[in-house]
Amino acid sequence: MRAGIPYASGVATFLTLKGSPIATMPMTGERLNLNDKNAADPVMTRVGEILKGKTVGVVQSTSQEQLIRAYFGSDVDTRTYKTSAERDLDITAGRIDVEFDSGVYATTALAKAENQDLIMTGPFMRGAMLATDVALGIRKGETEPKAKFDEVIRAAAEDGTIRKLSVKWSKLDLTPTLSPAAASSQ
């Protein structure tokens, strides 16, 4: 299998209780590419300072868990859960300070009545070890279908179709960043 260009680019972010000191993280609601070390490192250092000594809830065996452990290590208490719903119960009960998950999950969680006391905080992160780009797998050697899919996806990104649909259904702009070089090399 070979992936075409991504048709969506998700993000990961934090959820915490309204009024929590964690709710004041830098770059709240702004995109942060963790692969851009010059831009990301100062922000992640500040996020780490805010999270130091706090309990962060993540779903086990996810790229979100990997990121928390890689960036913050023993400075935070990383608590893992089998499901996001289990973790949501703990944050609303005050047993953890903050949770970290995909932005799409976060917007879905905030729409639930039982999560009315939660708020998104911190940057919308992508890159590094986060699994955020979503692409269609096409068999190797099938260059014609891949080229057609890539063309349609690029057009939908450029004309705003992906943005319109992703905001409608997930409340986030999931339009991928498509560079001309990346498109021709894939």
Region annotations inferred by a language model:
Residues 43, 64-67, 84-87, 102-106, ...:
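Stable alpha-helical elements in mature extracytoplasmic
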Residues 17-38, 131-172:
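Extended ligand-binding regions for polar small-molecule ligands
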Residues 1-56, 61:
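A conserved helix-loop-strand patch within extracytoplasmic ligand-binding domains
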Residues 1-2, 46-49, 70-73, 85-108, ...:
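Short helices/loops that flank or line small-molecule/ion binding pockets
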Residues 8-13, 104, 111-151, 172-186:
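Periplasmic-binding protein-like
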Residues 78-81, 122, 164-168:
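Surface-exposed patches in mature extracellular/periplasmic domains of secreted proteins
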